Design a protein with these regions (language model features):
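Active-site substrate-recognition segment that forms the wall
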Residues: 1-38, 47, 53-55, 61, ...
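Helix-loop-beta segment of a Rossmann-like dinucleotide-binding subdomain
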Residues: 39-48, 128-132, 155-161, 181-214, ...
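Short, hydrophobic alpha-helical segments
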Residues: 64-71, 150, 224, 327-331
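Secondary-structure boundary elements
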Residues: 68-72, 93-103, 216-225, 241
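Dinucleotide-binding Rossmann-like beta1-alpha1 core, especially the glycine-rich loop
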Residues: 120-195
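A non-catalytic, amphipathic alpha-helix used as a structural packing/dimerization or gating element
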Residues: 137-145, 214, 318-322
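Loop-centered beta-sheet repeat module
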Residues: 223-228, 244-251
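Core beta-strand elements of the Rossmann-like FAD/NAD(P) dinucleotide-binding domain
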Residues: 236-244
């Protein structure tokens, strides 16, 4: 079977840029009691790099457990969740299922978050972790929850991902949690102008515009209140009326908590082409291409230390020129150094275990 080649003849619908919250010592997930006000208990959940959607349900379950244990001890009934990206929304979902009163405080709501700019493949990319056992649990819980949501309006579907080289992010899953996803199948890639040796993986596609909207809508239906608020420092967080606070602010955590680990912005670009229903596969490891209901997503890039969310036309064109060459419908051009798959970017895109803080 030959898979259809993407149509690159029409200009992009739009270009987008988002900023991944990459934490040098691994993502942070822990509960702490405030030294200045012992009644305040803060669960920190941030620094997930490019793996936010992939890990979301898994880390949210661990956040919920910390909140439940604290509420059982203190008899608090109200919880503040800071942030309305995928980490905040999934955490709020599981916490409100405990019967607690949840209020989400956020500077930006779901349409304007980094999560909304994500490509959506389930593959834990560009993230460091410090506890292998907990990370395995996160992977298992997250994947199985997404898998159970197929066909329920969450924008989740199973997909083949064709790659010309091993995919290190999916291989992490294969190696750490055998059997969670199928092992990759070596094969000649099934494309008219790209019949080189490669691999076929099987994973999930989570479409952020559908998934985030569904979470947001369900929370509103369950009487979770949303309030727009910016937190400038730790004092502004501790001034909240809730005693249990869940910090899912991503890069915003730099402003509100003392953290010795580097929390670094990593800018990524996407180009969105018109949706093409005939494309039912994913492609990665030499450029990536994720056909979704709203668009065909072309990515991605990796600019370390850049906090800007402004798309750059020249970078967008580089992405398009490169992927056209890969699929044999344009001149072959070298992989841009800014591309996430370029070897120079590996120190910041690898998913690996570190000694965490």
């Amino acid at each position: 079977m030959i898979e259809p080649t993407p149509d690159f003849t029409t200009p992009p619908l739009e270009a987008k840029a988002g900023v991944r919250p990459w934490r040098e010592n691994g993502y942070r997930l822990e509960g702490t009691v405030s030294s200045s006000n012992p009644r305040k208990y803060i669960v920190h959940n941030y620094g997930h790099g490019g793996a936010g959607i992939s890990l979301s349900w898994g880390v949210a379950s661990q956040v919920r457990d910390l909140v439940r244990d604290r509420a059982t001890h203190t008899h608090d009934t109200a919880v503040a969740v800071l942030g309305s990206g995928v980490m905040g929304l999934t955490a709020a979902t599981l916490i409100q299922e405990l019967g607690l009163k949840v209020t989400v405080y956020a500077r930006e709501f779901w349409q304007d978050t980094t999560s909304h700019v994500a490509g959506g493949q389930w593959a834990p990319s560009s993230v460091r972790y410090s506890d292998e056992g907990k990370f395995k649990d996160v992977l298992k819980i997250a994947y199985r929850r997404f898998e159970s949501d197929i066909g329920k309006g969450f924008g989740v579907s199973k997909k083949f991902n064709y790659t010309p080289a091993p995919d290190p992010y999916l291989d992490v899953v294969v190696n750490l949690v055998p059997g969670l996803i199928p092992n990759p199948v070596p094969m000649n890639l099934p494309f008219e102008h790209l019949a080189t040796p490669g691999f076929r993986y099987e994973t999930l596609l989570v479409e952020p515009p559908i998934f985030l909207k569904k979470l947001n809508d369900d929370l509103h239906r369950n009487n979770v209140e949303f309030k727009q608020k910016t937190f400038a420092n730790a004092a502004s967080v501790l001034s909240l009326q809730e005693n249990i606070i869940v910090n899912c602010t991503g890069l915003g955590a730099k402003d509100i908590c003392s953290d010795p680990s580097k929390l670094i912005p990593i800018k990524g670009h996407l180009a969105l082409l018109k949706s093409q229903a005939r494309l039912t596969y994913l492609f990665s490891r030499n450029g990536h291409l994720f056909p979704r209901e709203d668009a065909v997503v072309i990515g991605g890039t990796n600019r370390v230390g850049d906090p800007s969310t402004n798309p750059e036309p020249a970078v967008t064109q580089q992405l398009l020129d490169h992927i056209k060459g890969v699929f044999g419908v344009g001149p072959i051009v070298p992989l841009p150094r800014i591309h996430i798959d370029h070897p120079d970017n590996w120190p910041y895109v690898a998913t690996e275990k570190v000694s965490g803080v």
